[in-house]
């Protein structure tokens, strides 16, 4: 690896627009953005970007698995192994996410994932852990037998089991004990995501006051309501989330979980309100169908772009981050710079890391992907200024 690199013949995708300038990287950081005809010291290695985009590395804050692993199965080195493969789909940072398990299994899984973070030295950055549950009002595909009530004690149990590496928790905030649980988690700067919830829509501003700052998989496991018998459209939970500017909205942009026209509707919000997440499970990214046991007796299949239980219930997704980017660009009709905010910058901000990553800006990590302009496929992925994946 060259200690100093100058990426030229590229278009930089930044939060404020595209820039036909050169990117200077020293060691693991972006140190400057300069005009193409500007002179810099001779010790910068010239890298020809072949007229590709330089797009910020994508950050997936909800990921239950990828290819051969489901993180809930607690297989040794599962996240370490996947970290080496995720650059192929444009992911430079992610939160392995946990399902609803019995208490002892939850503690063991969280501890194992925490240890994996310490061991991981190659590939995508494992940025922390996302506990999706166990405090749900609506279980979705999760095991309803493993749901628990929120409490301060549970919050501390999750924090302790992850050795301080807990970055996000999805919770139904209408449950008894949720306020105290949320406020305890916020003391450790943990992002609180409303999800699997049937909360009163009028309570959403109060939840934001408590510390809820995001919504998990918008429109999914969040009930909407039709017009009432008099023809009045009542306020739904998703309406209230859209209206609450303090809450960022997580979106599984596979064209299955959320109708493309609803994606376009969300895209009219300010760009910093929406972020892309995959909710991917084992088998995502696989070219062949994959079957697995989500929990004892609950079998799932991943095929034809969809992850579902044998009885047809959606069970996460088979989406990859690069597919989500491509879909969001198509459905939202936003510019590629605006899409980069949803794919990279807002996820980083949600988990408190936007000062270090999430955009092509000076003094941030040199984590980015070279995207071909003609088809938006990945040509190469760089993490800390080092090439970690290159397409054939």
Regions found by a protein language model. Give the residues of each.
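N-terminal metal-binding scaffold of metallo-dependent hydrolase/deaminase domains
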Residues: 1-40, 375, 382
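Active-site metal-binding motif and surrounding structural segment of the metallo-beta-lactamase
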Residues: 37-55
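Metal-associated gating/positioning segment near the N- to mid-region
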Residues: 50-108
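Conserved, mostly hydrophobic/aromatic
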Residues: 62, 131, 185, 215, ...
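Active-site gating loops and adjacent loop-to-helix segments of metal-dependent hydrolytic enzymes
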Residues: 64, 85-95, 139-162, 206-248, ...
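Divalent-metal coordination cores built from histidine and acidic residues
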Residues: 83-165
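Active-site core of metal-dependent hydrolases
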Residues: 156, 160-287
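His/Asp/Glu-enriched, well-ordered alpha-helical/loop segment
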Residues: 233-249, 267-278, 284-364, 368-371
């Amino acid at each position: 690896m060259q200690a100093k690199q100058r990426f030229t013949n590229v278009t930089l995708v930044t939060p404020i627009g595209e820039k036909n300038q050169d990117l200077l990287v020293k060691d693991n950081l972006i140190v400057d953005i300069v005009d193409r005809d500007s002179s810099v010291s001779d010790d910068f290695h010239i890298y020809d970007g072949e007229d590709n985009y330089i797009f910020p590395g994508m950050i997936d804050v909800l990921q239950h698995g990828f290819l051969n692993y489901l993180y809930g199965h607690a297989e040794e080195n599962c996240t370490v192994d996947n970290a080496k493969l995720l650059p192929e789909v444009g992911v430079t940072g992610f939160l392995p996410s946990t399902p609803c398990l019995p208490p002892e299994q939850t503690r063991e899984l969280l501890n194992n994932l925490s240890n994996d973070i310490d061991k991981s030295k190659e590939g995508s950055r494992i940025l922390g852990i996302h506990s999706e549950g166990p405090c749900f009002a609506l279980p979705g595909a999760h095991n309803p037998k493993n749901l628990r009530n929120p409490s301060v004690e549970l919050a501390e149990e999750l924090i302790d089991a992850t050795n301080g590496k807990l970055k996000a928790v999805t919770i139904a905030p209408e449950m008894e004990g949720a306020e105290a649980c949320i406020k305890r988690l916020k003391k450790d700067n943990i992002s609180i995501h409303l999800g699997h919830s049937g909360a009163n829509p009028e309570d959403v501003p109060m939840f934001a006051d408590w510390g809820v700052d995001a919504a998990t998989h918008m429109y999914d496991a969040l009930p909407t309501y039709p017009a009432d018998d008099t023809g009045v459209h009542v306020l739904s939970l998703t309406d209230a989330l859209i209206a609450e500017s303090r809450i960022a909205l997580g979106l599984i942009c596979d064209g299955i979980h959320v109708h493309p026209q609803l994606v376009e509707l969300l895209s009219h919000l300010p760009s910093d309100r929406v972020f892309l997440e995959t909710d991917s499970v084992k088998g995502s990214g696989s070219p062949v169908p994959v079957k697995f046991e989500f929990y004892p007796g609950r079998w799932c299949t991943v095929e034809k772009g969809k992850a579902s239980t044998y009885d047809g219930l959606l069970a996460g997704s088979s989406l990859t981050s690069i597919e989500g980017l491509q879909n969001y660009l198509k459905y939202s009709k936003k510019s590629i710079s605006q899409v980069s905010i949803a794919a990279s910058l807002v996820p980083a901000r949600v988990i408190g890391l936007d000062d270090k990553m999430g955009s092509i800006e000076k003094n941030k990590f040199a984590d980015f992907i070279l995207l071909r302009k003609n088809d938006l496929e990945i040509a190469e992925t760089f993490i800390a200024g080092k090439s970690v994946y290159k397409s054939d």
